[in-house]
Amino acid sequence: MVIKKEMKTEYVKPLVYTDRVKRQIVVYAILSFIITFLLTKNLHNYLNLVGIISIYLPYLLIYLVAIITNPIENAIKKGFENEARDILKNDDNLIKIGITGSFGKTTTKNVVNDIISSKYLTLITPASYNTPMGITRTIREMYKPIYQVFICEMGADHVGEITYLMDFVKPKYGIVTSIGPQHLNAFGNLDNIIKEKMEEIERLPKDGVGIINLDNEYIANYKINNTCKVLSVGIENDKADFSAYDIKYSNAGTTFKVKLDGKAATFKTILLGSHNVTNILCGIALARELGLSKEEIIDGVANIKQVQHRLEIKKINGFTFIDNAFNSNPVGCKRSLEVLSMMNGKRVIVTPGLVDLGKEEANENYAFGAYMKDRADNVILVGEKNTEAIYRGLKDSGFDINNVKVVNSEKEAFNEVYTKYSVKDTILLENDLPDAFIH
């Protein structure tokens, strides 16, 4: 069976000894030598004690290594960061863009880059590099004076982190993609999340430009404490400065219209989902501020590349998969289902459910299950325990439970797909997937 061939392939990252690990190994070895020497020097007097200590010695050594090396590592880290700050500070002509949000950051970052790179030489934080060290590494290792724009993804799962990154990068342009209960445990409550994400706009300079998603209720209801220019985007939203309408989906992607210069402009993209239309609107709004013409923006949108594992269309063994395996969330999963509902053949969703939602996890998964009604024909749930709330949501919504299959592993899920469905069907993979598929 094809799935067995897929699952047999192993994708394991090779072990890499970083400079930090090497320093820790050296300290560990020195401490081991010293303690072993002291214990064995008078071994005959402390034989019983040596036996007891040897059991706990590895834990003691790890603790001591951390105590000794942490100040050194922090100093090195701070030095690297200061070097990155100086690089940004010394380039007065560099246009800096910050992008944050509970979800949609990475996709929006890539969308912005694809749209404006026809006019500007851009430096972009790779993958999901959105922490101080990730940003520092990007600047130190990839920056060159020829770059005209720095597009920086900014992540946060604790209060104060966006403030820190804004002080670090000092962008003139800021985008807040969306806000929701992501990392709720770390933030404590939703109000902290809202306030933290909106720091992206509130800490822009007075001549800066903020771009916000007006369809997000938390953003729309937030009173921004800044006098900088703020542009809004939305879908069929008359209050938004940039609004998309006449949206159509197919296996080839999405088409939609936006009014530019008072006239309707038609955009085509390979990306799927209304949330991706919102992400593109953010890119369109920013591109206008950066001086791109309507034609340049239309071409830029058409050239947007798919982002791996974010509603990415894949053809494997003749089957059509919609891969949304990366970091599914309460908003994104509903958008995925909306896309699935417009596809041909049987509409199948494979999911292990939503995670990292704190006390709201069960409620959000229940709502996720209920939302599948009329949007999916068949459901494959991976893991009985963690998908129990989804199952209840499906059942209570009136979904035909005979079309729900609960399996214990991703391998079983793929077996189900390849044996029960045909190449005419569409399979949505929502949230984490096995390495054999992802790679």
Feature locations, PLM:
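Glycine-/small-residue-rich active-site loops that bind phosphorylated ligands and cofactors
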Residues: 104, 130, 157, 182, ...
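ATP-dependent carboxylate-amine ligase
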Residues: 1-70, 227, 285-294, 299-439
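Phosphate-binding loop of NTP-binding sites
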Residues: 1-27, 33-214, 218-228, 287, ...
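Short, surface-exposed amphipathic charged segments that create phosphate/polyanion-binding patches used
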Residues: 139-141, 190, 241-253, 414-426
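Conserved strand-to-helix beginnings and helix N-cap segments that scaffold or border functional pockets
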Residues: 136, 162, 187-190, 280, ...
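Acidic, Mg2+-coordinating active-site environments of NTP-dependent enzymes
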Residues: 176-321, 345, 370-378, 387-405
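Fold-independent oxyanion-binding glycine-rich loops
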Residues: 100-102, 126-127, 154-155, 178-179, ...
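A polyampholytic, Gly/Pro-enriched intrinsically disordered region
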Residues: 145-150, 251-255, 422-434
